[in-house]
């Protein structure tokens, strides 16, 4: 991400935004003036971190608490933004699933269904929805991370 670039005319959608890499992307984008749509499954952390970002940078932050591994999550997220009149110019597709159990104690079907939906299908759909809009408006950028631990 370019440093010291004025992003005040842009809105960034960041998934997995309540912690880790997603949160740091949100902080850096806000520091450069970008308004944010922060998405996470963890409402408490999401609201706390969004408030910190607003307090330190003064940008507008929309928070959406959503499980992106659920069916039709990408469409629901995109529709929410459209209904609020939010135009996404920057997409940071970062949501992931972190399991703190030993792999031998984790149901392989659960990993397969939820993790693959989140890191592949939903990320792909969100990217396509946002990119179509970016192309229509002649600009934008996206980054996708797929992390599993």
Q: How would you label these PLM feature ranges?
A:
Residues 15, 88-96, 144:
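Rossmann-fold scaffold of SDR-type NAD(P)-dependent oxidoreductases
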Residues 11, 18-19:
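Conserved glycine-rich cofactor-binding loop
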Residues 127, 131-149:
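Catalytic loop of short-chain dehydrogenase/reductase
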Residues 43-44, 65-76, 108:
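The beta1-alpha1 cofactor-binding region of Rossmann-like NAD(H)/NADP(H)-dependent oxidoreductases
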Residues 32-48:
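Conserved glycine-rich Rossmann-like NAD(P)H-binding loop of the short-chain dehydrogenase/reductase
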Residues 1-12:
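Flexible N-terminal pre-Rossmann segment of NAD(P)-dependent oxidoreductases
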Residues 75, 83, 98-112:
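Conserved mid-core segment of classical short-chain dehydrogenase/reductases
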């Amino acid at each position: 991400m370019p440093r010291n670039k004025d992003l005040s005319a842009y809105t960034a959608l960041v998934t997995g935004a309540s912690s880790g890499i997603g949160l740091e992307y949100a902080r850096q984008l806000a520091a450069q003036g970008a308004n944010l749509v922060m998405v996470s499954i963890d409402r408490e952390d999401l609201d706390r971190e969004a408030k910190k970002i607003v307090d330190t940078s003064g940008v507008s932050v929309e928070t959406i608490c959503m499980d992106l591994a659920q069916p039709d999550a990408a469409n629901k997220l995109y529709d929410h933004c459209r209904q609020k009149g939010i135009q996404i110019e920057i997409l940071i597709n970062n949501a992931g699933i972190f399991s703190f159990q030993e792999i031998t104690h984790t149901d392989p079907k659960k990993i397969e269904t939820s993790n693959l939906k989140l890191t592949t299908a939903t990320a792909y759909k969100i990217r396509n929805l946002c990119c179509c809009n970016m192309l229509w408006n002649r600009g934008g950028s996206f980054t996708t991370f797929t992390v599993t631990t």
